Regions:
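Signal-transducing coiled-coil linker helices
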Residues: 1-55, 92
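Flexible, glycine/charge-rich interdomain/linker segments that couple
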Residues: 2-11, 26, 38, 139-153, ...
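Active-site loop/short helix in cyclic nucleotide turnover domains
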Residues: 28-36, 66-80, 92
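Active-site-proximal structural segments of metal-dependent nucleotidyl cyclase/transferase enzymes
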Residues: 46-76
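Alpha-helical scaffold within the catalytic cores of cyclic-nucleotide enzymes
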Residues: 51, 84-89, 119-134
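Conserved helix-loop-beta segment at the catalytic/binding core of cyclic-nucleotide signaling proteins
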Residues: 55-57, 85-115, 135
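A short glycine-enriched loop-to-beta-strand structural element that forms part of the catalytic core
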Residues: 63, 100-111, 128, 134-163
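Catalytic cores and conserved motifs of cyclic dinucleotide signaling enzymes
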Residues: 76-83, 116-120, 147-166
Length: 166
């Protein structure tokens, strides 16, 4: 975790240079470099730290795609769940980051997409999840949340708190 945090904070010094580039690819690379999204899953604590740093205008708009796996009455090991989620992660774009909220509950952060693009992308990811699940889970559902003008970490905390109450 400390190594991840050091990477995020060390990349913060490069933000001025990368934000100055007007090219769309450079902006997506900025998101990927900022959070090193292609390498691993993030846990809930690191996601919160990352979201606290997501107030940057270069990252907006931000949408959250929360994915819930209904595991029925069967026990799935973390390895089985992560094997499935790695398939999903391999399909993510440079401006998308995936993390685990808790077992069977994941989030994909969709940076720099307008509302319609985010809906289309979430539907595409959802269809891919259904295809790759091979009927292992009774249901896979998702919620798409637009952060809007609120603080990204506040929206994340409110949603996850609400899910714990259900």
């Amino acid at each position: 975790r400390n190594r991840k945090l050091e990477k995020v904070t060390s990349n913060a010094g490069n933000m001025g240079f990368e934000k100055a580039l007007d090219d769309e690819m450079a902006k997506n690379i900025y998101v990927q470099n900022q959070y090193n999204s292609s390498h691993e899953f993030y846990d809930n604590n690191f996601l919160r730290i990352m979201l606290q740093k997501s107030d940057d205008e270069a990252l907006k708009p931000i949408h959250y795609m929360f994915i819930h796996l209904d595991m029925m009455d069967r026990y799935y090991s973390r390895q089985e769940i992560f094997h499935f989620m790695r398939k999903i992660r391999s399909r993510l774009h440079q401006n998308e980051i995936m993390g685990e909220v808790k077992k069977g509950f994941f989030v994909i952060l969709l940076y720099r997409l307008d509302e319609q693009q985010a809906k289309d992308r979430a539907d595409e990811i959802y269809r891919y999840c259904i295809r790759k699940s091979e009927n292992a889970y009774r249901s896979i559902r998702y919620d798409l949340i637009d952060v809007g003008v609120k603080k990204p970490v506040d929206v994340y905390d409110a949603y996850t708190r609400k899910q714990e109450e259900v």
